[in-house]
């Protein structure tokens, strides 16, 4: 199975053991394993999405232009950019979609974020609108 290295880990926040679905998602999203107090940890899906929600709501984002219609900025294609909603790594095509639809990337806490196809389709998760940080 492709998530075996994550199968026996616990979530870094809620301390629950990862089930097979969360282990596979960690593998697909290339989540790095962290070591806390001598234990290896990853993150479950609900904690990851809650953490990303807090990041979007507590820290105001800064827009980053992905490049003009004819030429993408070189850093966009070579750097890892994660989805601001689900935490997955954006593919080359997903980065291109940002450029072609003139949708900005956003920086939260020095990390560039965008939206993946799954979080874009059917309007389930709308583009980020800059709002003041919650007090």
From Swiss-Prot:
GO BP of this protein: DNA-templated transcription; regulation of DNA-templated transcription; symbiont-mediated perturbation of host apoptosis; symbiont-mediated perturbation of host ubiquitin-like protein modification; symbiont-mediated suppression of host innate immune response; symbiont-mediated suppression of host type I interferon-mediated signaling pathway
Cellular compartment(s): Host cytoplasm; Host nucleus
GO cellular component, one term: host cell nucleus
InterPro entries, alphabetized: E6, E6_sf
Renumbered zinc finger spans (unnamed): 11-47, 83-119
GO MF annotation list: DNA binding; zinc ion binding
Keywords for the protein's UniProt record, in alphabetical order: Activator, DNA-binding, Early protein, Host cytoplasm, Host nucleus, Host-virus interaction, Inhibition of host innate immune response by virus, Metal-binding, Modulation of host cell apoptosis by virus, Transcription, Transcription regulation, Viral immunoevasion, Zinc, Zinc-finger
Keyword Transferase listed: no
TM regions (residue ranges): none
Lineage top rank: taxon: Viruses
Function description: Plays a major role in the induction and maintenance of cellular transformation. E6 associates with host UBE3A/E6-AP ubiquitin-protein ligase and modulates its activity. Protects host keratinocytes from apoptosis by mediating the degradation of host BAK1. May also inhibit host immune response.
Assembly with partners or alone: Forms homodimers. Interacts with ubiquitin-protein ligase UBE3A/E6-AP; this interaction stimulates UBE3A ubiquitin activity. Interacts with host BAK1.
The family this protein is said to belong to: Belongs to the papillomaviridae E6 protein family.
The protein's name in its UniProt record: Protein E6
Originating organism: European elk papillomavirus (EEPV)
Gene: E6
């Amino acid at each position: 199975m492709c998530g075996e290295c994550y199968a026996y880990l616990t979530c870094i926040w809620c301390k629950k053991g990862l089930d097979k679905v969360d282990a596979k998602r960690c593998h697909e999203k290339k989540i790095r394993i962290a070591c806390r107090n001598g234990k290896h940890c990853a993150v479950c899906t609900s904690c990851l999405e809650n953490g990303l929600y807090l990041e979007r709501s507590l820290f105001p984002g800064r827009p980053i232009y992905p490049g003009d219609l004819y030429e993408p900025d070189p850093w966009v294609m070579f750097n890892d950019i994660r989805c601001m909603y689900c935490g997955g790594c954006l593919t080359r095509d997903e980065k291109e979609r940002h450029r072609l639809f003139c949708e900005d990337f956003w920086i939260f806490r020095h990390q560039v974020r965008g939206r993946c196809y799954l979080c874009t389709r059917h309007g389930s998760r709308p583009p980020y609108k800059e709002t003041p940080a919650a007090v």
